[in-house]
Amino acid sequence: MNNNQIIDMQCNETTGRIMRPVAYIKSDFTSKFGIPRQSGLADLEAEIHFYPEYQNPEAVRGLEEYSHLWLIWEFSQAIRKEWSPTVRPPKLGGNTRVGVFATRSPFRPNPIGLSSVQLTGVTLNPQDGPVIHIQGADLLDGTPIYDIKPYIPYADSHPEARGSFATAHRDDHLQVQFPPELLNKVPQSKQKSLIQILALDPRPAYQQDSTRIYGFPFAGLEIKFRVEEETLYVCEVNKEERK
């Protein structure tokens, strides 16, 4: 997606309201494969850049007084003309159907995503206005951001909440075998977050072939791996070939 492109979305057919992105994400993911399935699961660094109309620094005054933010964004790679009342969550093996409003599937009537991220700083770019630096984002590079709201701990945190099937395997992690000669090809500042991503098992839940080689682009690199039982083995790290 062109980061300068502003996408209009018809949100309410009755009132005719139009919702426009105010910003977009710069992240290390140029493909959906490998992106954590929820925010906050890996210490991924990203930046929020505003479109020209919203680059007034006054709009982010006071933002640094918060530690976390809510991002409201668009599943820009999952827009469909039709919608289905049920979807098949990967966590359930890809065969069991659940109501779309009982999941966080990207295939929704309105392709809206919601992510809680950590705010690490705000800088001012003389040409492009304020840049918001975040950690823990689960967003594709170029994702349109519709709104940014502060996370309010006393209102937004619900430790007693139930999470249905989404929490059934939340503590499952793979052991990651990353040969030093391959790990050294990854910038040191990206190594920790990459290992966290791999430990989360990027594969679709229904693919368990131990001989298959998987790959995804990350931070300008192509990461290839295979999984055998509970261990992930990194096979190759090469420069990403841009299409």
Task: Give, region by region, the residue ranges found by the protein language model.
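Mixed-charge, low-complexity intrinsically disordered regions
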Residues: 1-112, 124-133, 137-243
